[in-house]
Design a protein with these regions (language model features):
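Short secondary-structure capping/turn micro-motifs that flank functional sites
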Residues: 67-68, 153-154, 223-224, 276-277, ...
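Conserved, mostly hydrophobic/aromatic
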Residues: 27, 59, 94, 137, ...
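Non-catalytic, usually N-terminal nucleic-acid engagement modules in DNA/RNA processing proteins
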Residues: 1-181, 293-297
Length: 370
């Protein structure tokens, strides 16, 4: 069977904001798109079929965690990640580089060997090179594959950021070679360079020379302010390729997403809606609420009376408050699904307003509210 090639087309523009379609052989993705995070082959506390019912068209999973547990060979034996977790949606996997830097007991970053580290689970030694990261992601049968890059810890040291960016470009070249010819999959480059305009510009230009199916913006959501993040996006919005999807990694809040879409970003992922859902924080069109608060004990209205999806409007704030204050697992499931559903409603509204040419008005109405 001939598999459909990976493809991206812009549909509408409203200044820098735009809608589009990413086509994969496992399904199409409307952009701007939000990807729920399924770190360890599961969107925590949720059945994948329920995640699909929220309107999610793609999810993200994590190479670092999956190569440690259960190991790529087990997933290959199951027929790939989609069959392993019974997921019909396209899946994007990150390279594992960010988690290596942030979670593991890192021993060494070697230009040729890659990242040499010990597992945060049992201390086992791993070597993650650009070639190994691509090998693992191919074994997972990911639909969108991320290159191996180095994501340094937050710093304002120009020389440190420059050295890291140069290493990431070298690893990008090796990732592209290791990926080979796989037209039915997408390989994304990752723009690094911290908060420095010249380094971000150089990183992007070098990645364009190598040639990728999409371009991610990495090294943000690591402690910088929202204004600093938007400044980086402003620096890049005029020079990012128009015909490739743009992915802002690890972002973010609804306000972050609105501001990034205004600056031309097409794709997002973040643990916020799922992690918040497990801790009792709900996103609504009127802002965030902590469902564990005592004021909801006698509130028999649903979180969102207009949300008929998954019958989520059948559950009152009174009941959800009870579930969380008695540590019942169902509370985490319901609120996680509510939050993912809210994020997908947000993305749908963003796309609709871009289509109508009213995105700026929508942005201004909600940027400080959500």
């Amino acid at each position: 069977m001939t598999l459909k090639n990976f493809e991206f087309n812009v549909i509408e523009n409203d200044k820098f904001a735009r809608t589009g379609i990413i086509e994969t052989h496992r399904g199409n993705i409307q952009t701007p798109a939000f990807m729920p995070v399924g770190t360890q082959a599961t969107v925590k506390a949720c059945l994948i079929d329920d995640v699909i019912k929220t309107g999610s068209e793609i999810i993200l999973s994590n190479t670092y965690h999956l190569m440690i547990r259960p190991g790529v060979d087990r997933i290959i034996s199951a027929g790939g990640l989609h069959k392993f977790m019974n997921c019909k949606l396209p899946i994007l996997t990150d390279s594992g580089g960010f988690q290596v830097m942030s979670l593991s007991k890192l021993n060494k970053v070697d230009r040729e060997k890659g990242a040499i580290f010990n597992s945060h689970v049992d201390g086992k030694k791993f070597i993650l090179s650009p070639e190994e990261s691509i090998r693992v992601q191919k074994g997972l049968d990911s639909d969108i594959v991320m290159i191996m890059d180095e994501c340094p810890k937050k710093t304002t040291d120009y020389d440190v950021i420059n050295k890291s960016m140069e290493l990431s470009i070298y690893w990008a070249e090796r990732s592209k070679i290791a990926f080979g010819l796989n037209p039915h999959k997408g390989l994304f480059g990752i723009v690094q360079g911290g908060l420095f305009k010249d380094l971000r510009t150089k990183s992007l230009n070098e990645l364009i020379k190598i040639g990728f199916d999409g371009y991610a913006i990495g090294g943000l959501a690591v402690g910088e302010s929202q204004n600093e993040m938007f400044s980086v996006l402003d620096d890049l919005k005029n020079i990012m390729p128009d015909d490739k999807p743009r992915y802002l990694m690890g972002v973010g809040t609804p306000a972050d997403i609105l501001g990034a879409v205004k600056r031309g970003v097409d794709m997002f992922d973040c643990v916020m809606p799922t992690r918040s859902g497990r801790t009792g924080l709900a996103f609504t069109w009127n802002g965030r609420i902590n469902i564990k608060n005592n004021k909801f004990k006698n509130d028999n209205e649903p979180l969102d009376p207009n949300c008929s999806n998954l019958n989520l409007n059948k559950y009152s704030k009174n009941y959800l408050n009870h579930l969380f204050n008695t540590n019942e697992i169902l509370g985490s499931t319901l609120l996680t699904l509510h939050n993912i559903n809210f994020y997908q409603e947000l993305m749908s509204s963003i796309r609709e307003n871009i289509k109508k040419g009213t995105f700026d008005k929508f942005h201004d109405e909600y940027i400080d509210k959500l």
